[in-house]
Structures are given as structure tokens and as C-alpha cells.
């Protein structure tokens, strides 16, 4: 079945977990050990193909309900801002933590645009889950599963999951169940395409590290292809036309980084094409609508100086080499980045749970899903129910982070009150409900310029500023917000080397 050499020690608690994880001599035990214990130096895993085809594979794996004497289990779906902040704050003396996510790291999204052009390296914005919550890799009852959740059975207190694989030389997609005492849905949202034809096939989003990698490779490929002998002037201009759809902070920051890259690096290292490369930002309404008019006008002025062209219009169709606006204008492009906001994911839409007016999972002031026991939702996938009388909070990192922190403290209080087990917290006083206070907004626009607005809203009184000082505040603030000292060091070193030597334009 399996063989592990040089395994240091398996504690009695670990042995009990393994015994319960194993059903009928299945290969799930070997799968668990291979993914769970970093001290295993050699592992041989039984192929799932040996299981008879007429047998339901889901019976071969799963985490059963916790027993008396074991810690209650908190299952977290997602590894974004909300889920990771919750896992960081949860008391692992009270709970076992199981995280289910299609990625094993958290992405520091405010700096993701900088990785697209080589200002920062990709590892600078990715923090492993095992560093955020060490119990995931150390405690016998805590796990991380690289998987997607496909179904919620709230009556049975179970989630149904399916492993994420490459479909080639690893395991075939493997279905399993996890019983929970407390479930936290923090699965985030997906990019909104508004049903526009061709967006999914031709545009690149900017929400994950692999998106930034794809943008960087595509950008550098187009730069090199445009210098090919014999290429027409028209085709060269198309290849070097970078189009950004969406004038929110992500779209504006990426446009600023891209224009900065063109002015400082492309013109020095790709002198033959420096006059043909340009950036166009398309927005249906005003850019940076969350900022006041003064800050928006400053951003437009600075981006225009950097060569960014603004087009007001609605995209109606996206083809492989051009997009078409509502007035019939055709815009050829070589790189298309789509940044038009987010909406509920297919998983969230599939759940038979109450929804808020925007289609997100409906919650009350304590992050609970009122219609089911022991289920909470935080981050971009959740919003207040209309019955609470509260408006839906914006899909921002600072909202998700503070919801995660609040819920971690709430679950810790519930656990200390002996309410950690399933269906045991009905009579526990939950305390003060969650209250969100906006701390302000920031956006960089390139060329050592940024916008900083420290007011609760764009119409309130307070501090707002622009220019170099704002850029310095923006960098300082985000450097301190990077989760680990390791990544802070990476970010600081990357900024320094970029300033001294320029951006890395290697296409690897």
C-alpha cells in the first residue's frame, strides 16, 4: 500500500486521525500522508485506478465528525484576505483548522500589479498558508487540502470537495467529504464579465499570481515579436497596444505601472519600438469613482503625461485581436487586461443559502448565515441581508481582513464558552456585532505619484493628498501590511534593485 522512509515520529493523536481517515483499505491514507507530513522523504502511493470502477470513490476518503475528547473542527473554504486573517487569529488550542482552497497561499493583491512588469517578483506577494497558520502543517488534526468545495450539506454538517490536479500524472480528481463543527465560507468572488462575448477566451484578469505571470509573459513576448524583420507597421502597433478595461483602482494602478515600465525600461532596452507601444484605459463611467473629483482629475492628468489614453465606452464584443465598443469603434490590441470589478462565483450561486441584493451569501451582523447552524461567511462572497438594515460592504481587502479578524475573535469566545462543537452555540451570547469603519483609500499612478485619501468617504472631511509624499505613504503603508517579515524583506529588496538596476525584463 504505502512506504515511508525516515519518518521521524507519529504521535498517538496522529495515529488515531490516520486510522479514522482510512476506510476499507483505501488509498486515501497514502494520499493524506504524502500531502500532510513534510518529513516523509520517500512515498509510494497506490494508484486510484486500482479501485473498481463500479464503486463510489467518495466512500474511500473523508474526515468524519469529531468525537468527545477531540478538539472541534473549523473548516475554512478559501485562502484570501478574509480566510487567512481568520486562520491567523484562530486559537488552535481550542480548534483544529482545516483549510480547503485551490491555492496554497495568500496573494497580497495591492502589490499584484507591480509583479506584471517586474517591479516586484511573484514570490514577494505570495504567502504560504502554512506560514500564516503553522498548525496546518504541525498539528495532527489540522490540514490543508488543495481542492474545491462542490457542495454544502448543512443538515449533515458536511462539505463535499474535489481535489485540484493537473489531470496528467497526478491523482485523478478525487472526491471526499469533511465534517465540520464550524464552517467559514471565505471563497471570495470572481471577475465580472457581464456576459460579454469573448472576454473569458481573450482577456487576462488580474486577481491571482498566475494572472500576473501570464500578463508579464504576454507583454514581453509582444515586445520581442514586434521587432521581427518584415512585420508590418500596423501589426507592430497592434502587438504593442495594451488595453485595460475598467477604471477602478486595479485598472488604474496597472495602467500606471505599465506606463512607468514603458517610459523607464522599454524606451531604453527596446529602442526600435519605443514610439509604437502605448496604453489605453477604457471605462464606461468615471475612473476611480470612489475618490473625489480633485484626486480623479490629478490621476487623469498624470496618467496622460505618462502616455495613457482614456476612452469612455462600453465593450460589446471581444475578439482575438480586437474589441468592439458600443458605438461600433474597433480597438485592436496585443494585450487585453480585464478589471471591471467582481461578482458572486458559481459555487456561491449554487448554494441554497439566502442571498443579499447583489447575489452574495446573506449574513447577519455576527457574520452568521441565519438559516443554517454553525455556518459563517466573510469576505467578498458575503453581504448583509436586507433585514439587517445595513448596506453591503465594498469588496475591498481591508473589509475582508477585518471581517476575518472579527470572526476569529468571535469563534475563540464561542470555543471558550464550550460552544465549539456542532449545534452547541445556540444559547451563547455573541457580544458586540461587527462594525466596519473605512480607513481610507490609496492608489499609485506611476512616476513616483500616488493618491491618498484618509477620509471615511469622499464627501467627508479629512486628509487627502497627491504627489510624491502620497507615493511614499502608499509604499510605507503596504510594506507594513505585508503579512510576514520574509515577504517584507523581499518587497524592500525588489524595490531597491528596481530603483538601482531597472526592472527585470527576462521572459522566463
From Swiss-Prot:
Recorded GO cellular component terms are: mitochondrial inner membrane; mitochondrial matrix; mitochondrion; peroxisome
How is this protein induced? Answer: Accumulates in response to ammonium but repressed by nitrate.
Binding-site residues for FAD, renumbered to this chain = 73-103
Q: In which tissues is it expressed?
A: Expressed in seedlings, roots, cotyledons, leaves, stems, buds and flowers.
What membrane topology does the UniProt entry give?
Peripheral membrane protein
Instruction: Give residues annotated as binding NAD(+).
Output: 240-276
Q: Which Pfam families match?
A: NDH2_C, Pyr_redox_2
Q: Where in the cell is it found?
A: Mitochondrion inner membrane; Peroxisome
Q: Which reaction does it catalyse?
A: a quinone + NADH + H(+) = a quinol + NAD(+); a ubiquinone + NADH + H(+) = a ubiquinol + NAD(+)
E.C. number:
1.6.5.9
Keywords of the record: FAD, Flavoprotein, Membrane, Mitochondrion, Mitochondrion inner membrane, NAD, NADP, Oxidoreductase, Peroxisome, Transit peptide, Ubiquinone
Asked if Oxidoreductase is a keyword of the record, the answer is yes
Could you tell me which residues form the transit peptide? 1-46
Cofactors demanded by this protein: FAD
Please indicate the residue ranges that the annotation assigns to the motif Microbody targeting signal: 499-508
- Segments carrying the region annotation (Disordered) are 48-68
Q: Name one GO molecular function term.
A: NADPH dehydrogenase activity
Q: Report the superkingdom from the record.
A: Eukaryota
Q: How is the cofactor bound?
A: Binds 1 FAD per subunit.
Identify the main location. Answer: mitochondrion
Question: What is this protein's function?
Answer: Alternative NADH-ubiquinone oxidoreductase which catalyzes the oxidation of mitochondrial NADH does not translocate protons across the inner mitochondrial membrane.
Protein family? Belongs to the NADH dehydrogenase family.
Protein name per its UniProtKB record: Internal alternative NAD(P)H-ubiquinone oxidoreductase A2, mitochondrial
Name the species this protein comes from: Arabidopsis thaliana (Mouse-ear cress)
Amino acid at each position: 500500500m504505502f512506504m515511508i522512509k525516515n519518518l521521524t515520529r507519529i504521535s498517538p493523536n496522529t495515529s488515531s486521525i490516520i486510522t479514522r481517515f482510512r476506510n476499507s483499505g483505501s488509498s486515501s491514507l497514502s494520499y493524506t500522508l504524502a500531502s500532510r507530513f513534510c518529513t516523509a522523504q520517500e512515498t509510494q502511493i497506490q494508484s486510484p485506478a486500482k479501485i473498481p470502477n463500479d464503486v463510489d470513490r467518495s466512500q474511500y476518503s473523508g474526515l468524519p465528525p469529531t468525537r468527545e475528547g477531540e478538539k472541534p473542527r473549523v473548516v475554512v473554504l478559501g485562502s484570501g484576505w478574509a480566510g487567512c486573517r481568520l486562520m491567523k487569529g484562530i486559537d488552535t488550542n481550542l480548534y483544529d483548522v482545516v483549510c480547503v482552497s485551490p491555492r496554497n497561499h495568500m496573494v497580497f493583491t495591492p502589490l499584484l500589479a507591480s509583479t506584471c512588469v517586474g517591479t516586484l517578483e511573484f514570490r514577494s506577494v505570495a504567502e504560504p498558508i502554512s506560514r500564516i497558520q503553522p498548525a496546518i502543517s504541525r498539528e495532527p488534526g489540522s490540514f490543508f487540502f488543495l481542492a474545491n468545495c462542490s457542495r454544502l450539506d448543512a443538515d449533515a454538517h458536511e462539505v463535499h470537495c474535489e481535489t485540484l490536479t493537473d489531470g496528467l500524472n497526478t491523482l485523478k480528481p478525487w472526491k471526499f467529504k469533511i465534517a465540520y463543527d464550524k464552517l467559514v465560507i471565505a471563497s471570495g468572488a470572481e471577475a465580472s464579465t457581464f456576459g460579454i462575448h469573448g472576454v473569458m477566451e481573450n482577456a487576462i484578469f488580474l486577481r491571482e499570481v498566475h494572472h500576473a505571470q501570464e500578463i508579464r509573459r504576454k507583454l514581453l513576448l509582444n515586445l520581442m515579436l514586434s521587432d521581427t524583420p518584415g512585420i508590418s507597421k500596423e501589426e507592430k502597433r497592434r502587438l504593442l497596444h495594451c488595453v485595460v478595461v475598467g477604471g477602478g483602482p486595479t485598472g488604474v494602478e496597472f495602467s500606471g505601472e505599465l506606463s512607468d515600465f514603458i517610459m523607464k525600461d522599454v524606451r531604453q532596452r527596446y529602442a526600435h519600438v519605443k514610439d509604437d507601444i502605448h496604453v489605453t484605459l477604457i471605462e464606461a463611467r468615471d475612473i476611480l469613482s470612489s475618490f473625489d473629483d480633485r484626486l480623479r482629475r490629478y490621476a487623469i492628468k498624470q496618467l496622460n503625461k505618462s502616455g495613457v489614453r482614456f476612452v469612455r465606452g462600453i465593450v460589446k464584443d471581444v475578439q482575438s485581436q480586437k474589441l468592439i465598443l458600443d458605438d461600433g469603434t474597433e480597438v485592436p490590441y496585443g494585450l487585453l487586461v480585464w478589471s471591471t470589478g467582481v461578482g458572486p462565483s458559481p459555487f456561491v450561486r449554487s448554494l441554497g443559502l439566502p442571498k443579499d441584493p447583489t447575489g452574495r451569501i446573506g449574513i447577519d451582523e455576527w457574520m452568521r448565515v441565519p438559516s443554517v447552524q454553525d455556518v459563517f461567511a466573510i469576505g467578498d462572497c458575503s453581504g448583509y441581508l436586507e433585514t439587517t438594515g445595513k448596506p453591503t460592504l465594498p469588496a475591498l481587502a481591508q473589509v475582508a481582513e477585518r471581517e476575518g479578524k472579527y470572526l476569529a475573535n468571535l469563534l475563540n469566545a464561542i470555543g471558550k464558552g464550550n460552544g465549539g462543537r456542532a449545534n452547541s452555540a445556540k444559547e451563547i451570547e455573541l457580544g458586540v456585532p461587527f462594525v466596519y469603519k473605512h480607513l481610507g483609500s490609496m492608489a499609485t499612478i506611476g512616476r513616483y505619484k500616488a493618491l491618498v485619501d484618509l477620509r471615511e468617504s469622499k464627501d467627508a472631511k479629512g486628509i487627502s493628498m497627491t504627489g510624491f509624499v502620497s507615493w511614499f505613504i502608499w509604499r510605507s503603508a503596504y510594506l507594513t501590511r505585508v503579512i510576514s517579515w520574509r515577504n517584507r524583506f523581499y518587497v524592500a529588496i525588489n524595490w531597491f534593485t528596481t530603483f538601482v538596476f531597472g526592472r527585470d525584463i527576462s521572459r522566463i
